[in-house]
């Protein structure tokens, strides 16, 4: 397949992600779904409520996923010996690590504290909070990786990550309309319409950088680095990829037609559609190393997103918990999840919802790669250095 045909195939597939849920929704509602176009998203109708059957099935899936991560040897993963690496002089933390600590502390305090100031500074804490956190994570990677991190070695990649992150999360906000707002933002009147678009655009720049910093941080630990890199070798045929691709198309349409039953497809459909499209076009994906038994990229980016998800939910919940429902954080979000909305631990996210982060991380990496392959820039986020 010629290069231009590969690029066109990826663009068409990415376009179908936007069109198929829309077509499904038009068939369902004979028009646009309730709440379509509201930004930020608002809750427009009550979800179906708790379902014991749906919840039980989800628990079974979650249990299997947990077993694979916690006990990989039960599923054919083998222990990989790694020769101890010689340790040189300790690498100090970079300057941006130290600068970011007070920024994070002040931002966190202002977000959670109930201070009556002349200017409502708590409105503007999300972006500095998260970018300082990203720089702290990068500083940890830098120290543990002998001075190698995204900021120190690939600053242009960090800039591109921020740009792609912004546009990719707008894509998820768009898809959210077709599952009738699985998440929504009750503090939508803190800013004007233009203010919401501007501020949320800045906020969305933090998603991909945070996930990839966590991924790189996990890789600096031998425990994670070798845990999933010697597993079952899975080679797939072109026929399988085509079937996998078609399955993604069907799920994307079904998400719009069955917004409650298939709400979870929002986090899953992009994986078969885009990863299969890239594989059919002979592009590298996080699944490519699996043919040699290396599952570490898929597993670690999932874990990285779960770890980061804890902070997303923790800081989000606390921003309203201490404020008696007063609107202080325009980025504050709540969930309206059908069938599974049980068991919250200092979080708006139901406990089972954290498993969705495993797939979300893969989605983010795949979208990043699609952008790189279409716009022809270096997508390699890996950095090398001596690890401990």
Task: Name each model-derived stretch.
Residues 1-388:
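Aromatic-rich, lipid-facing transmembrane alpha helices and their immediate juxtamembrane interface loops
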């Amino acid at each position: 397949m010629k290069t231009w045909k590969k690029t066109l195939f990826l663009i068409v597939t990415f376009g179908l992600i936007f069109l198929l849920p829309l077509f499904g929704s038009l068939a369902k509602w004979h028009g646009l779904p309730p709440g379509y176009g509201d930004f930020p998203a608002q809750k427009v109708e009550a979800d179906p409520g708790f379902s014991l059957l749906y919840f039980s099935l989800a628990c079974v899936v979650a249990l299997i996923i947990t077993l694979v991560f916690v006990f990989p040897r039960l599923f054919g993963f083998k222990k990989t010996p790694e020769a101890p690496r010689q340790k040189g002089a300790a690498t100090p933390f970079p300057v941006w690590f130290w600068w970011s600590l007070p920024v994070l502390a002040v931002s966190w305090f202002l977000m959670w504290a109930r201070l009556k100031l002349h200017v409502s500074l708590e409105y503007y804490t999300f972006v500095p909070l998260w970018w300082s956190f990203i720089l702290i994570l990068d500083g940890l990677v830098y120290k543990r990786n002998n001075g190698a991190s995204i900021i120190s070695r690939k600053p242009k990649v960090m800039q591109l990550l921020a740009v792609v992150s912004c546009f990719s999360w707008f894509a998820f906000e768009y898809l959210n309309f077709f599952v009738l707002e699985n998440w929504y933002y009750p503090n939508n009147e803190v800013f004007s319409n233009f203010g919401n678009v501007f501020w949320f655009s800045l906020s969305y720049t933090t998603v991909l950088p945070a996930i990839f910093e966590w991924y790189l941080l996990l890789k600096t630990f031998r425990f994670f680095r070798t845990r999933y890199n010697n597993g079952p070798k899975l080679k797939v045929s072109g026929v399988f990829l085509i079937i996998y691709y078609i399955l993604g198309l069907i799920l994307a349409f079904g998400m719009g037609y069955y917004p409650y039953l298939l709400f979870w497809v929002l986090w899953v459909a992009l994986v078969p559609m885009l990863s299969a499209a890239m594989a059919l076009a002979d592009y590298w994906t996080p699944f490519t190393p699996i043919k040699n038994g290396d599952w570490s990229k898929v597993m670690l980016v999932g874990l990285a997103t779960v770890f980061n998800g804890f902070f997303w939910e923790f800081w989000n919940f606390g921003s309203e918990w201490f404020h008696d429902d007063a609107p202080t954080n325009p980025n504050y979000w709540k969930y309206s999840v059908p069938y599974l909305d049980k068991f919250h631990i200092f979080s708006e996210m139901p406990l089972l919802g954290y498993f969705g982060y495993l797939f979300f991380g893969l989605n983010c990496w795949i979208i990043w790669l699609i952008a790189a392959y279409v716009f022809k820039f270096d997508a390699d986020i890996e950095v090398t250095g001596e690890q401990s």
